[in-house]
Amino acid sequence: LGWGGILEKLAFYRKKHPEHAEFYDAEELVVHGVQNWISHAIEESERLARVERHPVLRENLLQIAQVNRNILNGAPKTMREACQWVCWFNMASRTYNRDGAGFQLDEVLKQYYDADMKEGRITRDEAIFYIACLLLNDPHYYQIGGTNENGDPLLSEFSYMVLEGADKLDSACNITVRVDENIDRKFLNKAVDYLFKNKNGWPRFSGDEALNRGFMRLGYPE
């Protein structure tokens, strides 16, 4: 959706539920606040780029400004934009209610990575760097691996890249490997290796079958 899409969705449901106008007013204030926050970052990146003498650093500042301009209203279209969008959401949600729950990191970001690779917009090393930057931004809880609703494995090359990004960061992360009975033992061993190598308490491990049964007990369909 992007921030602009969220505003459109709020406007749509405001018309359907005018009795909840106060609620929608509050939601719109939050989104506009985040957009204002992003706008300041764009302005500061451009200001720093004007005085930066190192060409690589100047180019990165200009890219930061453009990435944030792209997601100010629109939905993310590249992996870098997706990571940047999540960074803003993480910071805003922490401020709002100390939220720490993330998502299935490998599955969500993989679609952007695959599209970028197809178009030649990114390299594997750049993607790992973006993952490390995202993990540095905030220790939100993320899952990797496990199975989908049909019991098929979600593990992919990108799952390995998440571990590599966390390894390069070499700091506290909140990554959990979903362990199912058919998990690729090579991946599981690699995850355990990182746990002992870095001694930073990651990754954690969660039994996928018990997790899924718990969700079903709460009313989620099989």
Task: Describe each model-derived feature in a short phrase.
Residues 45-50, 112-116:
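Hydrophobic side-chain positions on well-ordered alpha-helices
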Residues 35, 42, 46-49, 58, ...:
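Heptad-repeat amphipathic alpha-helical coiled-coil interaction surface used
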Residues 28-36:
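Extended non-globular scaffold/tether segments
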